[in-house]
């Protein structure tokens, strides 16, 4: 019984432990291509192509249509006009299949920005945006990537509340310094 209790405590501690964005500011952002959806229409997203237009806000979220992820997508959708004025592209990434993201991009992203499917966790793992080594879902991690392909901001927090605000501040700071 004591062993079972200890195992349960360890499991709870591991699940409660925060994930950390381990790609640091200044690191080279891993390039990727992924199937994405915007306004319910699928397309192939390329980070390299997006960076030619300006900075990219890349945010990872655990799962479409869950409470926190829905509210986070709503927040990014509301801020898209401001991100666009700064020349920034926003893309969300999760493990969800593309058909689920077709619906999510229409309803929760309000057809304002794309979301990409990373069903094999290749992108999440390359950005150290997973909860643990055997995790299927992404940690809630946001990056701002400069047009040169460098990480200029990284933030991990399971609470969705500040991801939009903090990435907006980072984009504003980057744009101001680039002038």
Question: Language-model segments: what does each one mean?
Answer:
Residues 1-9:
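Bacterial N-terminal signal peptides that target proteins for export
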Residues 30, 55, 139-141:
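Short loop/turn microsegments at loop-to-beta-strand junctions
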Residues 47-70:
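Short active-site neighborhood of thiol/selenol oxidoreductases, capturing the structured segment around
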Residues 111-113, 131-143:
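Structural micro-motif
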């Amino acid at each position: 019984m004591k062993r079972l209790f200890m195992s349960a405590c360890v499991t709870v501690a591991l699940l409660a432990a925060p994930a950390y964005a381990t790609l640091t500011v200044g690191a080279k952002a891993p390039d990727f291509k992924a199937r994405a959806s915007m306004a319910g229409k699928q397309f192939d997203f390329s980070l390299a192509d997006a960076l030619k237009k300006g900075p990219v806000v890349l945010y990872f979220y655990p799962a479409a249509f869950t409470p926190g992820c829905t509210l986070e997508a709503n927040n990014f959708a509301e801020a898209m006009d401001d991100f666009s004025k700064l020349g920034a592209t926003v893309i969300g990434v999760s493990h969800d299949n593309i058909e689920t993201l077709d619906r999510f991009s229409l309803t929760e992203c309000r057809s304002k920005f794309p979301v990409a499917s990373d069903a094999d966790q290749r992108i999440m793992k390359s950005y150290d945006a997973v909860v643990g080594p055997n995790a299927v879902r992404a940690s809630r991690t946001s990056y701002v990537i400069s047009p040169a392909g460098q990480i200029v901001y990284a933030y991990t927090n399971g609470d969705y509340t500040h991801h939009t605000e903090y990435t907006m501040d980072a984009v504003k700071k980057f744009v101001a310094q680039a002038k």
